[in-house]
From Swiss-Prot:
Annotated signal peptide: none
Keyword vocabulary terms for this entry: Secreted
Protein name per UniProt: Septenin 1a
Compartments it resides in: Secreted
Organism field: Osteopilus septentrionalis
GO cellular component: extracellular region
Key word Cytoplasm present: no
Family, similarity comment: Belongs to the Frog skin active peptide (FSAP) family. Septenin subfamily.
Amino acid sequence: SDAVADGDHAISGVVDS
């Protein structure tokens, strides 16, 4: 959900798939 690029990670409020 709404993944935001953070270096080489994907940060999201809720991790879904």
